[in-house]
Amino acid sequence: MWDGFSNSFWSRDYITGINRAQRLINEGVEQNEKLLQLLHIRAKSASSCSDLLFKSFSKFNKHHPLNEESNDLPSDAAIHQLYESYLMEASLHKKLGEQLNILVINPFANWSKKYSRRVDEIVSAAIVKINNYNSRFSHVNSKKSNLTDRKPIPTSRKSNKSDSLASALSQLDINPSNVNKFDGLINIVDHPYTAEEFANVLLKLMKASTVKRKSYSHLGDYELVTNCSLLFEAIKTTFGLEKDSYVVKAGNQLIQHGLIRLLGIRRVFENDPEIDAQFTTKSQQLLKSYHLSILEVDPYFQVNDPITATNDDPVLQKYNLAYDNLEQCRHELELYLFMVFKDLEQAELDRLNAVKSVLVECSNYSGNFIPSLNSIFIDNLNSFKNLDSLRDMSTQINKHYTGYFIPVSNNELSTKDEYLFLQKSSLTEDNLIVSLVPKILAYLLDAYSYERDEEVLSCVWTTEVPLKDAFDLKSVLRKTDNVESVLNACVEKYTLSSITCSLRLCLLEFPDSLIRSSFYDYFKAIYTTYTDFEDLDHRLYSIKKCLLHLHSTPLHILEEIIRHLSAYAISIRMKDGQIRHLAKIISPCVLRPPDDLNIIPVEDTHPTLLVIDLINEFENLFADLERPSTPPVEIERALTPITTSPQKLKLPRSSSPCKNPSPTRRFRPF
């Protein structure tokens, strides 16, 4: 199935896709030159043949004058007639050459020059836009480099939405009004403590951790700071824990209770001397409630929180502004490139149609002027009329294909040690998308029943809509909690296809696909080996094995989407071709290649095949699936791409339908 230029020439760096599209266009320009040269040769040969015939007949007539009055014999008259026919043929050759130049060659040559200028202007403007984006990216990257010594980095940017933090806290089961209160017992590694008992334990823990004031450039001074390595040993001795796994568990429980926070992007406690931790306001208030304190003076409450302090720091404000400009530039660039690819596609289609017209016209003129060769030109004419411009373009696209559209993520602006440099896709925004997906699916499910046109209903997910409309609707949806009322208010402006497209954009903006990109080569090997219908059990076993490794959040979203698409496909009685088209559109959300893969091979159809199996075999795959439990504190980590392979899944060997060694051993991420 062919998607045209707009979904075939995307790359992570943008410029590679543009260069491939330009290479295709340049091959078309070379084809124009080749055709013009051939037509020039034909016209020149016709004129040369005419000149040669006239010159030769003049010499013949000088030595053997032919006069109708002397044609007494029938044979002389026949020879004279032959001479006249040759003269007529010479004049026809001359006229053919002139007509080819006037009616075919010159117009096509002028059109080719305009075509070359047209595509050059389109590509040049796109390259200027890309260079502008790259310069902005370098500017932001240089600002990031100037802040590399700054720790901690804020874990999220201030959201434009006033209640977004409350939304995130609600998903983490944290009530802001009760954030500094303890009700009942405090359990740490299955040991219950009363609030007073735990206050004394917490004081010992602070002293053992050697907490101190620490200064961070551009952020100021912070009290009660220690590194995770010292804190690890302090927890081990204070709570009397022997196993390191219990120490890690205790540290994570302290984080969940809001007594400790890790400074940076980390959300899971571990024995790492490079990561700093801070005892929070809640822990200090717990000590004060029992007249305990580790600080002689209590300046802690006057220290700005790193999240809110960011907004008052001039250096970080400049970084915020530069980052916002970069994201705005990226947004505009992707919209512009869609238009560029559409223009290039139309230009190439116009060129192929022009070539077809030139070939047909040339055959028409040649056949009319030279009756003796008319049968040959008729055959050529029939062949030229059957030329399929779209098929030629599809072949060229497959030859130069770079990949389908995936919005570029600027997650690389974070440092190598994973400290977050004001990353745009923060935990709060990701949680908004997580809550947004089921609401949109529920609205669509209700909207299907009101659509009476079956043809429109069957194309809700596959109809192409302007990318700008989808971006605008996505922005509106992410700023509201009442999705249904917003969609009802926008029903006249946005179609159901715009809603589905905006939903796909939300999913594409996740740092990783719903099935982690580390499984990309694994599924490629699966669908390269098990291609027959008889291999369905092998594929389903491999898919289910992968699903067991997913975090609960992306697994829940994946299940909701596949359940919706499966019911949608059944309700409108989708055929295999329609399901394949639907799967190809949704596949980048489900499984996409790793970030280091700049060009996606056109042969990589396994994400589409995977989605087809998920839709067709939904009940078999998700019915008895054991969901892994993901603690609320790990939601951000669940939505963050990983570079390490998941641990090997321990399943009974007898449950596998594969009797022979699996061909995916080298790709298997388990």
Swiss-Prot record:
Phosphoserine: residues carrying this PTM: 645
GO cellular-component term (any): cytoplasm
Residues at the site labelled Arginine finger: 462
Ranges of residues in domain Rho-GAP: 425-622
GO biological process: cytoskeleton organization; small GTPase-mediated signal transduction
F-BAR domain: residues covered: 3-392
Disordered: annotated span: 141-161, 641-670
Molecular function via GO: GTPase activator activity
Keyword Transmembrane helix: no
SUPFAM superfamilies, per database record: BAR/IMD domain-like, GTPase activation domain, GAP
Protein name: Probable Rho-GTPase-activating protein 9
Organism: Schizosaccharomyces pombe (strain 972 / ATCC 24843)
Lineage: Eukaryota, Fungi, Dikarya, Ascomycota, Taphrinomycotina
